[in-house]
Amino acid sequence: MRHKKLKGKLGRNSSHRSSLLANLSISLITHKKIETTFTKAKEVRRCIEKLITIAKNNNLQAQREVQKVIKNKQASKILFEEISPKYLERNGGYTRIVKTGFRKGDSAPLAIIEFIE
């Protein structure tokens, strides 16, 4: 049974998966919108929503917690100065996932993940 199994494995080991999610999170923060597979988009949403909620505190502890996941200082700066202030009044639901069809090579379902304005 699959009870209480919250995160997807994405066909990778744990270090590869955490690197993938960190890189996708950095791309989403810098570009505000990315296209990826639907499953990866759902996993990135879990990661990025937690990071934005932490970043809304905007103190040293929050910066250190975000730096554990996002090792990019420029992306961290964008998160704290541009993205998190927009969502101070919002409790979750900072991103939107829109299905865009299937990839030509392997018919993987694609989706666009973006920040809600």
Name these PLM-found stretches:
Residues 98-103:
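Short, solvent-exposed loop/turn elements at beta->coil junctions and helix N-caps
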